[in-house]
């Protein structure tokens, strides 16, 4: 009945009446996502009628409800045949200011029309393979990049940027050819990185360092949404970027990683939005070549170093809250390097563990990122080892019992999801510099057996990667408990597969123990 009435008024052709009836339809069906199949033909005819109205050049006040209704109807894949013609797609491109490269964005009154047109295109392209093919033929990705360049520094048109970026994300998600076009032909990597810089209002203090105002206001909802869409589009553009072949590529990835470091250190308007923002930043960091992730940490300036040394001494004894803040800040500094971003990643990982669900989608990206960072960058590994595997003092409880980050990760080593338990074990193994004896010390033999069996290390030894050597960090508690722990060591094996006699196994272990040290 709603479609019949709307179609009758739309065909009558009076702009004021069309505006009223379509606004009523839009208000009533704003949250409708499932449609009656009996009215399918009426909805198709209503779409055709709306395009005829849009061609006439009706006022903006009438164009907006027309596009709102078209957006609602385009949620139904079955009625998109009359919508996905080249003529109708061109109408939407014109209304979205995508039809001309030199068209300006000066008329504020047109902004709602541009936004609604982009929303329609998002739905239509996502739901129709015909529209996807037309998007390639009409070079829609290039037109979207041109629109972004017009508005990348204009904060008052965040909605336009947001839906432009969303449409870019949809296109690059559905077509690998568009990913390649965005990356190389359209210079999508620097363009989208600049969009992020604008959303975060970044002020650079060095080539790869930005000023962080911890006391500043959170991002606005519009800035946060815009940043999230840019992060998602960048993920698609860089999804195959495992190796850097040119110096210019390396520089651009480092700039992007520095922007993502800034992203991790700011907050959105709500806790949920902050988590969504950081989650997309983590996903994108996973695409950055690991050699470029060194910019996640940066040296303290002379002023910061002096302030770090003086803060605790200057605070009087009764200033407990201030001292707690200073201690927290000090915990994010390691070996003269600012580790705030790594600390945020570690906290993010722990929150995802505490959720207790969707580990594969929510936890494995950040665990993989921290593992690769630790393997490639010594300072990051040493900082994470200090946070996750501090000197072992609790030798009375099993490694998986407790509420520390170590306990939580050890519990994951026996998780039912193979991918989750593998990456949790790999992370701890890398923090132990791939030394079997060190891993057993922190996790226990039973928890580590799966990883060691997969790597052929059940008899001991270490992994293939090289790590620097440092001093022994065994605590007195661990040294006292060690004789008991040695009783649980597995027996040795002879080349023919028979068990080594106990005396020979113990003497071999003593030699190994004398020539090795448990390090950082």
Curated annotation (Swiss-Prot):
Similarity annotation: Belongs to the synembryn family.
Any GO CC annotation of this UniProt entry: plasma membrane
Entries under Pfam families matching the protein: Ric8 (PF10165)
Keyword S-adenosyl-L-methionine (UniProt): no
Record's subunit section: Interacts with GDP-bound G(s) G-alpha proteins GNAL and GNAS. Does not interact with G-alpha proteins when they are in complex with subunits beta and gamma.
Function: Chaperone that specifically binds and folds nascent G(s) G-alpha proteins (GNAS and GNAL) prior to G protein heterotrimer formation, promoting their association with the plasma membrane. Also acts as a guanine nucleotide exchange factor (GEF) for G(s) proteins by stimulating exchange of bound GDP for free GTP. Acts as an important component for odorant signal transduction by mediating GNAL (G(olf)-alpha) folding, thereby promoting-dependent cAMP accumulation in olfactory sensory neurons.
The species this protein was found in: Rattus norvegicus
Name of the molecule in the record: Chaperone Ric-8B
Gene field: Ric8b
């Amino acid at each position: 009945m709603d479609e019949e009435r709307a179609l009758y008024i739309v065909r009558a052709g009076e702009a004021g009446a069309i505006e009223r009836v379509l606004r009523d339809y839009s208000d009533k069906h704003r949250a409708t996502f499932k449609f009656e199949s009996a009215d399918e033909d009426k909805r198709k005819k209503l779409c055709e009628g709306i395009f005829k109205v849009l061609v006439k050049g009706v006022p903006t006040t009438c164009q907006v409800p027309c596009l709102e209704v078209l957006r609602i109807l385009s949620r139904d894949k079955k009625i998109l045949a009359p919508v996905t013609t080249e003529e109708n797609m061109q109408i939407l491109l014109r209304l979205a200011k995508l039809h001309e490269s030199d068209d300006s964005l000066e008329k504020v009154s047109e902004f709602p029309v541009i936004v609604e047109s982009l929303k329609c295109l998002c739905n239509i392209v996502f739901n129709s393979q015909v529209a996807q093919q037309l998007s390639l033929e009409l070079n829609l990705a290039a037109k979207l990049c041109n629109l972004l360049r017009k508005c990348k520094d204009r904060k008052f048109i965040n909605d336009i940027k947001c839906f432009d970026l969303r449409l870019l994300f949809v296109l690059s998600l559905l077509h690998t050819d568009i990913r390649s076009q965005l990356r190389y032909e359209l210079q999508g990597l620097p363009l989208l990185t600049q969009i992020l810089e604008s959303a975060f209002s970044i002020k650079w203090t060095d080539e790869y360092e930005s000023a962080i105002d911890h006391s500043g206001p959170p991002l606005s909802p519009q800035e946060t949404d815009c940043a999230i869409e840019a992060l998602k589009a960048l993920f698609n553009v860089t999804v195959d970027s495992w190796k850097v072949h040119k110096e210019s590529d390396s520089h651009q990835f480092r700039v992007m990683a520095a922007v993502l470091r800034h992203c991790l250190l700011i907050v959105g308007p709500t806790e949920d939005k902050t988590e969504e923002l950081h989650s997309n930043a983590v996903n994108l960091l996973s695409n950055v070549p690991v050699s470029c992730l060194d910019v996640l940490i940066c040296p303290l300036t002379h002023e910061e170093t002096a302030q770090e040394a003086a803060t605790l001494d200057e605070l009087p004894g009764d200033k407990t809250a201030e001292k707690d803040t200073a201690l927290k800040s000090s915990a994010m500094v390691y070996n003269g390097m600012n580790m705030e971003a790594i600390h945020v990643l570690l906290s993010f990982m722990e929150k995802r563990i505490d959720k207790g669900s969707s580990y594969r989608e929510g936890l494995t990206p950040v665990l993989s990122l921290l593992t690769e960072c630790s393997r490639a960058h010594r300072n990051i590994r040493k900082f994470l080892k200090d946070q996750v595997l501090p000197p072992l003092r609790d030798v009375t409880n099993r490694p998986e019992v407790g509420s520390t980050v170590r306990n939580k990760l050890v519990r994951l080593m026996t998780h039912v999801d193979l991918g989750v338990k593998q990456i949790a074990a790999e992370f701890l193994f890398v923090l132990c510099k791939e030394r079997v004896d060190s891993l057993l010390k922190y996790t226990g033999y039973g928890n580590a057996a799966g990883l060691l069996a997969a790597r052929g290390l059940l008899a001991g030894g270490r992994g293939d990667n090289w790590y620097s050597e440092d001093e022994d960090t065994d605590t007195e508690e661990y040294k006292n408990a060690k004789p008991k722990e040695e009783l649980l060591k597995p027996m040795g094996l002879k080349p023919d597969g028979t068990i080594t006699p106990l005396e020979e196994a113990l003497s071999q272990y003593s030699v190994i123990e004398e020539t090795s040290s448990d390090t950082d």
